[in-house]
């Protein structure tokens, strides 16, 4: 077998920033920061959402800190090219 062709598979500390929950698991993700957890130093990777904070798994509806791309587009450009309301159409006649 050839050497050095596989990514480094190591223990990584994932942090769900919305729920403030830490997960220690193995992954090939590359990180620049490390953090101490339960007396050992691990590579650290922050997450916006995980199973600890996702509405499907928690059963509660909550707003996330980031919007979807479609929602932000509609927020910016929703008024352009839309249909006129009935009151506006009557006033125009």
From Swiss-Prot:
Superkingdom of the organism of origin: Bacteria
Listed transmembrane segments: none
GO cellular component entries: ribonucleoprotein complex; ribosome
Entry keywords, A to Z: Ribonucleoprotein, Ribosomal protein
InterPro entries the UniProt entry points to: Ribosomal_bL28/bL31-like_sf (IPR034704), Ribosomal_bL31 (IPR002150), Ribosomal_bL31_B (IPR027493), Ribosomal_bL31_sf (IPR042105)
GO molecular function: structural constituent of ribosome
One GO term of the biological process aspect: translation
Protein family per UniProt: Belongs to the bacterial ribosomal protein bL31 family. Type B subfamily.
The protein's assembly and partners: Part of the 50S ribosomal subunit.
UniProt xrefs under HAMAP family: Ribosomal_bL31_2 (MF_00502)
Name of the protein in question: Large ribosomal subunit protein bL31B
């Amino acid at each position: 077998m050839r050497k050095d062709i596989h990514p480094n598979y190591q223990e990584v500390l994932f942090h769900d920033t919305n729920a403030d929950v830490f997960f220690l698991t193995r992954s090939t993700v590359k990180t620049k920061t490390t953090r101490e957890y339960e007396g050992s130093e691990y590579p650290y990777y922050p997450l916006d959402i995980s199973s600890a904070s996702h509405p499907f798994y928690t059963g509660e509806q909550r707003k996330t800190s980031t919007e979807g791309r479609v929602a932000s587009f509609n927020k910016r450009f929703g008024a352009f090219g839309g249909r006129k309301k009935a009151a506006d159409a009557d006033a125009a006649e």
